[in-house]
Amino acid sequence: MYLSIIILPLLGSIVAGFFGRKVGVSGAQLITCLSVIITTGLAILAFFEVGFNNIPVTINLFRWIDSEWYNILWGFQFDSLTVAMLIPVLIISSLVHIYSISYMSHDPHNQRFFSYLSLFTFMMIILVTANNYLLMFVGWEGVGVCSYLLVSFWFTRIAANQSSMSAFLTNRVGDCFLTIGMFVVLWTLGNLDYATVFSLAPYINSDIATIIGICLLIGAMAKSSQVGLHVWLPMAMEGFFSRAFLKLHYMQEHPVLSLGPLRFSLFGKIQDQGQFAGNSIRSSSEITSEAFMLKESWFKWWFIGFVEGDGSFIINKDGYLEFRITQSSPDAQILFMIKKELGFGVVRKQDSVRNTHCYRVRDKNNLIKLISIFNGNIFLDTRKEQFKLWLNAFNLKYKENIPHIDSSFRPNLDNAWLSGFTDAEGCFTCSVYDNKSNTAKLVRLRYILSQKGNSSCMEYLAEILGGKKHLLKSYEGYNVTVNTTKLSPIVQYFNLYPLKTKKYITYFNWIKIYKLVIDKKHNDPENLLLIMKYKNNINKSDYNK
């Protein structure tokens, strides 16, 4: 049983990686998921057997290094600490595998991804169960290699390759210190076996013990991206921030978790308390304890688009200036993501009656950072005027002389502006009609952007999207509507620049219908039932509003 815990994820990875074309996408998904789930079940059994009964299990497979100076065995130790650590590692890995089936369903390289993911799990198990430092180092390096492979999963993207290389090289700093610590242990005790080291530890010179401890600590800090060695983490988000690097994905963006508004409100309260604690420690109302660098242009343009829809530049009656984004509380996770990416600002409950949260920035230095983002990069006419007045007020209040840059920016399908604007002002709809000429059904899909005023801007968006602009008198604004036959460029766009709010849930159902319609499978009775199911999910969803 204990060997199965170690071997099963490796077998799943080998099958998905080397025989992916034979077993197919579904086969690779099924084999890797089953191997990890079975491993999790076995680990739970091991937890009861070893943890409760306190009966450690040691497996020595073979001698790895055998010399007159030292002996290293390829062995594994299952004690109370090991099985306790295996439980969260394998449960989380199982959930990641299962969720990735739908999350990566549109990617053509599923087999490779699931192979990497199972290999990651295998290396984690090696890291946790090894009974000596050298074998632990093998698992340690394996986790680093798998992280590199996952971050650079889309290897045709330069940013992904740069991000993976940054993560890989930064982790080598930690590996260097870990290796030094291991050599000091070997030089001092002549053995790397845990049992030997722990039994002789009380007799080691205190200075040497301190050196060993510091080296091992720095190694762990680099691997877990702690202070000073965290610089690779923001770039590592490039690989799977928007798709499938789920072990580094912000949990508040998880579309499955987003389906539970009650749980989401609870998460928001936890975030509020965490923000308060961090603010208290740092003696600051806005600067977070771990500032993420704004390096990726995708976030910059997504953020600008989102703010043009839902943000505001406020000149308060009391004289202070403020930047604010307001969202309903069930969608507050996007505000926490923005705060995390920018590295400053406050997210808090705004209105208990209307159930809203807001992201707010008032600090002068952070407002200057926001000015550098928006100045000259705003598209909507009304937002340009608002920003210009706000910037003039800022210069007067703080006696600054920041020039206003007239914006000539025009959105296109080569940056994330439209994704952000859609998260704020877009929706996806589906209608099913009877065909009067025959028994077949007509399925109508639409992508809609809405905005009050800004007629010329909406006309431009209609032009680049291949849609039409409609005047809505009751709304005193305009809709840009793109119908089924013109949706292909938009679908390709959202594959490159995915939505970040819970509208992704609606889009996920909508795109399934789109694929059936494009493949002309929508009139199959079974598929028609699926379409009606997806349609109901779209139309009843609050996330599409």
Curated annotation (Swiss-Prot):
EC number annotated for this UniProt entry: 3.1.-.-
Regions crossing the membrane: 1-21, 30-50, 81-101, 119-139, 140-160, 177-197, 200-220
Molecular function per GO: endonuclease activity; NADH dehydrogenase (ubiquinone) activity
Pfam families reported in the protein's UniProt record: LAGLIDADG_1, Proton_antipo_M, Proton_antipo_N
Membrane topology note: Multi-pass membrane protein
GO BP annotation list: ATP synthesis coupled electron transport; electron transport coupled proton transport; intron homing
ndh-5 exons 1 and 2 encoded: region residues: 1-239
ndh-5 intron 2 encoded: region residues: 240-545
Annotated InterPro entries: Homing_endonucl, LAGLIDADG_dom, ND/Mrp_TM, NU5C-like, Proton_antipo_N
Subcellular location: Mitochondrion membrane
Additional remarks: Encoded from partially processed ndh-5 mRNA that terminates with the in-frame coding sequence of the second intron.
Protein purpose: Mitochondrial DNA endonuclease involved in intron homing.
Family membership noted in the UniProt record: In the N-terminal section; belongs to the complex I subunit 5 family.
Name of the protein: Probable intron-encoded endonuclease 4
Gene source species: Neurospora crassa (strain ATCC 24698 / 74-OR23-1A / CBS 708.71 / DSM 1257 / FGSC 987)
Taxonomic path: Eukaryota, Fungi, Dikarya, Ascomycota, Pezizomycotina
